[in-house]
Amino acid sequence: MEQSKRVSMMREKFEAQSNEAESSPPPNRKPPPPNKRVQTNGTSSLNSSGSSFVSPSPSPSPSPQQPVKRPLPSPGVNKQAPPALPTQPRPQQQQPEIPVRPTTPTRTPPNLINSNGTSGGSGFSSSSGNSGYSSSNNNNSNSNSSINMNGNHSNGLNGGSSNPVPMRKVSSPINIANGTTPPPPPQPTPSQQPQQSPSSASHNNTQHNIPSPPPLPNNKPKKLAPTAVPAGLGSIIGGPKTPAISPGSTSPSLGSSNGNIPISTTSTPITPTPPISVPLATSPNNSHKDSISNSNSNNNNNNNNNNNNNSSNATTSPPSPPVSNVGNKQDEEKKGFLSIFTNKKKNKDKKKEFSVGSPFNVKHNIHVNYHSVTGFEGLPKEWEVILQSSGITREDVVEHSEVVIDVLDFHMQQQQQQAQQEQQALMQKQMQQSGIPAHMLNNPKPPTIPIRDANKQPHNQLQPTPHQPPQHHHQQQPPQQHHHQQQQQQHNNNNNNNNNNNNNNNNQQSAQQQSAGILSQQQEQQLEEMMCGGAYDDEQYDLNNQPLPDETNVSLYDLVSQEDPTKLFGEGSTKIGEGAAGEVFVVTQLKTNNKVAIKKMPLNQQNMKLIVTEIGIMKSCRHQNIIDYIDSYLVGDSLWVAMEFMGGGCLTEILEQFNSVKLVEAQIAYVCAETLKGLAYIHSQHRIHRDIKSDNILLGSDGSVKLADFGYAAQLTKSKQKRVTIVGTPYWMAPELIRGQNYDRKVDIWSLGIMAMEMAESEPPYMSFPPLRALFLITTKGIPDLKDQNKWSDDFKDFVKKCLDKDVENRPEAKVLLNHPFLKTACNSNGLVPAIMEAKKAKEAHSKFSIH
């Protein structure tokens, strides 16, 4: 009686749950395809994954009405129907793990037979449309329900059979009973997998201790038509792929009216395991963290059915395996969390790697081409603006496109050099603040230049002049002997062996200094003899007598003096000029009480090579038309170059006062002749000045003319008999130099012709044009004639014309021009003194006027 009451109570609760489930909206997820199974009675069914397999079912326990026990079915024998009312739970048998592959179902599961012998609805149909599995026939729900040995109820696909059905991934139910949350489910071990109760019908029994009667024996389940689909099959939830069933597990139970899928777990067929509870989600917003729900409708359905679960004390199903999306999200969250530290680490590494240093091997290659239709290609916008502002017309571009490209290339290089100099100046200021010399940081190994003599000389020893006639070598034996002795002493000093009379280091140093002083004096005497009488004959400047030198490297420290310049010169100094290379001061030499010009140049990686070149050439050149080099000194992060002081200033100072002081042809011829003598001398040494202009022609108070500023000078060698580097001042540059073609010493002759026109007209041609336009005109149009042709003689005009010949082969050498008729009209040095004095007076008057 008590059992029948419980059955009736169970039926009433089931009907109430079914009615409540009918009011909820149908789910929008599809069920997993059923798995096809081969039953023992010869019929086949489908599991939830759609794969066909044969699974033995555990033998049912004998019921009280039928004391005779049924034998356990085998895979090859047809199963017998279980008794109507089993008196004890049936033992379960562990099933081997069978991989399940989801496929599309081709037919529906067979109809099940209820206890009355009539065919009930499909176990998948749901009359309420809820996410659970309720019976389509509520009247037969009790007869079709089965109770496992743990007291859990479950629904099955086959009446009376205990074949396992693979687990389906669904959302775990939400249980809000008494506001408590069950503990998280324990993780099953490989030896103990969650067991699932066998299913019998589409009835959901809410009691735990009352077994449901099995279907009538010997009733063969009917099959659905191939095209028939159980009601509500399309609304069943469609989860991810069904995982493989591990050994010892059974099929999940189906058919809970409220959408829950209670699962009972047993580790062995004899010893039952307690039901597994699931962590609950108290809010639909957080349900994606605690459950495997994929839609808001499932969350709502779970929340609506919590009370039914609590009232029936039904055990909740364990959570299904995690969805891949959740794992991906967790990986992304983990990756994003870890990326915070990795990004910080990268930023720290970047900060550590960042250091202020001097640029090296700076290149800024811009390839510009010209198309007749589209115009310039590859030209930056800023260069387009410069090209438009330079005054170069479109007709000029079309007619001389290659020349325009060469001119732009030169202008780009000039801009790059200027930017590099500004960057070096900024770095120099930073190094001055740190108290470290710039040349020590930027240039641990100073650049070298090719010089004539391979033997390194001390700082106070001059290089032997390369243009010595052969007879002087035979006459001047003592310098050669002293030179050999000094080399031997240097070799002995390096090997710590003293071959002289003195055996101590002090005597060695004094002997070396004494021999160096004797050599210096004798070389000076030799140079004076060479520059006196016959110094300008053709043999002296004959290039055929001077072979090309080999390239020999020398560093800056081999050229500078180790003495303290503050002890050699007076404290008082007067600034007389300032240029791009540095500032020029006038000081008094304490030893001779003569005025000396000191050029203070900051050292950086950009100008180091130019400085070394300038010092090397000035130190090895001794000529009356070249500025006398005294010595150079390293002071902090700058280089002091001491040279001869020229009281008359530069030639530009006279040309600036053109309104009050105008040079005549005799004076112009004198300056040109003296300049040509200096050029012929350096050309005989296979050197190029490359920056001949009025700013680099220094004048003495006595009217002497000397070349200065060898910063752009170049040494021609056997490996470099011509140069292609584009350097110089735009208005004085030769066309072949502008275009970067192979050029030689004749570029200095072109610059001399421009300087001659500058002395006649106070400025070089195209001075009123922008530099880019001037370069273009020099290359394409050449140099125009003198403005006032009647004012100048034919010899002067011919001299200028020969110097400015665009054909390099027809342009004469310096030694040839020295014999030009125009130079024979030159005055002496005294004839230039009045112009120098008048220019100084005009400059002083102008400065006083500007102050007041």
From Swiss-Prot:
Classification of source organism: Eukaryota, Amoebozoa, Evosea, Eumycetozoa, Dictyostelia
Protein name listed in UniProt: Serine/threonine-protein kinase pakB
Active site, per annotation: D691
Region (Disordered) location: 1-334, 419-526
KW Phosphoprotein (keyword) present: yes
CDD domains to which the protein is assigned, alphabetical: CRIB_PAK_like (cd01093), STKc_PAK (cd06614)
Entry keyword set: ATP-binding, Cytoplasm, Cytoskeleton, Kinase, Magnesium, Membrane, Metal-binding, Nucleotide-binding, Phagocytosis, Phosphoprotein, Serine/threonine-protein kinase, Transferase
PROSITE patterns in the cross-refs: CRIB, PROTEIN_KINASE_DOM
Job of this protein: Regulator of the myosin I component of the cytoskeleton: required for regulation of cytokinesis, phagocytosis and pinocytosis.
Enzyme Commission number: 2.7.11.1
Catalytic activity reported: L-seryl-[protein] + ATP = O-phospho-L-seryl-[protein] + ADP + H(+); L-threonyl-[protein] + ATP = O-phospho-L-threonyl-[protein] + ADP + H(+)
Comp. bias intervals (Low complexity): 44-56, 90-117, 124-163, 246-270, 293-317, 419-433, 486-514
Family: Belongs to the protein kinase superfamily. STE Ser/Thr protein kinase family. STE20 subfamily.
Residues reported in the UniProt entry to bind ATP: I576, G577, E578, G579, A580, A581, G582, E583, V584, K599
Subunit structure: Interacts with rac1A, rac1B, rac1C, racA, racB, racC and racF1.
Any Pfam family: PBD
SMART domains assigned: PBD, S_TKc
This protein's record includes keyword Membrane: yes
Organism per entry: Dictyostelium discoideum
Domain CRIB: 356-369
Modified residues (Phosphoserine): S8
